[in-house]
Amino acid sequence: MAPLKHLEKENPIIDACFQDFCASHGILTIEDFLLHDLYELTAFSQRQTNADRLKEGITLILSLIERQCRPLVNGLKLLEDLHRNKHTLSTGDKETDSLLQGGFREGQLTELVGPSSSGKTQFCMQAAASVAENHLGRVLYLDTGNSFSARRIAQFICSSSDATLGQKVMSRILCHTVYDIYTLFDTLQDLEITLRLQMNVNESRLRLLVVDSISSLITPILGGSGSQGRALMVAIGYLLKKLAHEHSIAILVTNHTVGAGGEGGKTKPALGETWKSIPHVRLSLSRDHKNSNCTISILKHTSLPSGQAAKTLTRKENQQCP
């Protein structure tokens, strides 16, 4: 759950004074607030010199919690939202776009699964360059393993021969390094607040969010028999899907593979069965190391049959744009 301090930027009434009052009662997060006796908390607030301000803060938090209880929406409204706000974004590869009938869908969480050196990061950078160049939107790239390369991104941009235009496209891509699950939580919660405050129009709108890789952050917290790690994993998944839907963002995350057990050396996506149900779309990327050809296939999709596949081609460093 979000710490109270994350609410201050959008709600000034939840200032340091209010946070200190809550902290004195062991309340640091929204979850703590829900678990506390609110009648007792209100009674304590009335004994303070700034009782009116504290009571206003308590009322505000309750209203914020109530707003998070999403209302029921009928199918017609969902369809209208799909046609009006949820567009497709090119992945940067024609064959993949054809396979996905246009590319990534805004409002959806897409997972790209593949073994090490299969080309997942290259695919992500190519997608980032494509969205920044062709869709005139911003891209936020969360890098968990120092694999992001601005030089490689620039090579994907076909307009790079025009230095001014190339720089403008590059300026639409913002990269943050994220090394643990808690930093990812903070980053996504700050992003949620920022998106709510700003007017998302034209080039200022965030259209693609990349997390490369989500599994490197989640795997370390899944050890042992406790359920806390899985709860954090589900919470991250929920937050990503919430951002995607409410702000019409296409979200792309990468996941590695693990042994499936048994003979034959088969593999399966990491993070287990709990995570399996979270992404809207699940794609598998494999590479033939003899000729460097890549194959992308659909493991799961909301509107397309699984099992379909296509050969992909990511441009080599010395290859010119068509």
From Swiss-Prot:
InterPro entries assigned to the protein according to its UniProt record, in alphabetical order: DNA_recomb/repair_Rad51_C (IPR013632), HRR_RAD51_Paralog (IPR051988), P-loop_NTPase (IPR027417), Rad51D_C (IPR047323), RecA_ATP-bd (IPR020588)
Single GO MF annotation: DNA binding
Residue pairs linked by disulfide bridges in the UniProt entry: none
Residues spanning the signal sequence: none
Keyword field contains Nucleotide-binding: yes
Keyword DNA damage appears in the UniProt entry: yes
Protein name as it appears in the record: DNA repair protein RAD51 homolog 4
Gene source species: Arabidopsis thaliana (Mouse-ear cress)
